[in-house]
């Protein structure tokens, strides 16, 4: 089973944008990518998800993250569905969608629930080193909240770049607002360093193990 922290498997996939090699197609450009699966083309919940993602596409790209979809449908089904979305909803889907019609990649990534033949609503966030940083699953009957996924991606980027952790509902946390959490001290020396930083006003603390600061 694939888990967070592992290298994304090297695979060649057929998509609506042609054949793509993952993760190289994105990592060689220095980009992160978001692989997400949907149960099936021409279904209502999936249509709302594709519409919602497309109108937020630039927000993902501003963070250096490229979406790529996947289902066990064939590529011609993807293309016809996208034509329908453009014609009926006025939105052109710009990101590629994998035609995993044999389910090989979906099986490898654990996207197909027990007893099912179609993919769940899985999301894999993969960084520019090809490492899986987050995995999220939704059931078929509940559509994803792309704004929450955007928050997750932004938080992962900040954590990677700044070496901090992000609290519940960041940047609207009920305790510390938009501030970020300093990793807990893991030695007596680090506890002293936290105390010194607190005395200088560089961080705030509820206790030695719960310190936070403004995002720099």
Swiss-Prot record:
Family of the protein in this entry: Belongs to the peroxiredoxin family. Prx6 subfamily.
Database matches in PROSITE patterns: THIOREDOXIN_2
Broadest EC class assigned to this enzyme: oxidoreductase
UniProt-recorded name of the protein: Peroxiredoxin
Coiled-coil residue windows: none
Disulphide connectivity of cysteines: 205-211
Subcellular location: Cytoplasm
Function: Thiol-specific peroxidase that catalyzes the reduction of hydrogen peroxide and organic hydroperoxides to water and alcohols, respectively. Plays a role in cell protection against oxidative stress by detoxifying peroxides.
Annotated keywords: Antioxidant, Cytoplasm, Disulfide bond, Oxidoreductase, Peroxidase, Redox-active center
Domain Thioredoxin residue range list: 2-158
GO cellular component: cytosol
Keyword Magnesium attributed: no
A GO molecular-function annotation: thioredoxin peroxidase activity
Catalysed reactions, semicolon-separated: a hydroperoxide + [thioredoxin]-dithiol = an alcohol + [thioredoxin]-disulfide + H2O
């Amino acid at each position: 089973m694939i888990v967070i922290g592992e290298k994304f498997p090297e695979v060649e996939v057929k998509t609506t944008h042609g054949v793509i090699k993952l993760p190289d197609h994105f990592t060689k450009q220095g980009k992160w990518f978001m692989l997400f699966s949907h149960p099936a083309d021409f279904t209502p919940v999936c249509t709302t998800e594709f519409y919602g993602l497309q109108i937020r596409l630039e927000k993902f790209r501003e963070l250096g993250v490229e979406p790529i979809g996947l289902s066990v449908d064939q590529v011609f089904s993807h293309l016809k569905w996208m034509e329908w979305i453009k014609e009926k909803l006025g939105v052109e889907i710009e990101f590629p969608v994998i035609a995993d019609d044999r389910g090989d990649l979906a099986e490898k990534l654990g996207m197909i629930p027990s007893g099912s033949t179609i993919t769940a609503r899985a999301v894999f966030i993969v960084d520019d080193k090809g490492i899986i940083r987050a995995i999220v699953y939704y059931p078929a009957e509940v559509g994803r909240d792309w704004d929450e996924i955007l928050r997750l991606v932004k938080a992962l980027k900040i954590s990677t770049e700044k070496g901090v952790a992000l609290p519940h509902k960041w940047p609207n946390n009920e305790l510390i607002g938009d501030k970020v959490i300093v990793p807990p001290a893991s030695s007596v020396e680090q506890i002293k360093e936290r105390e010194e930083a607190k005395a200088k006003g560089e961080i705030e603390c509820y206790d030695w193990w719960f310190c936070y600061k403004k995002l720099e």
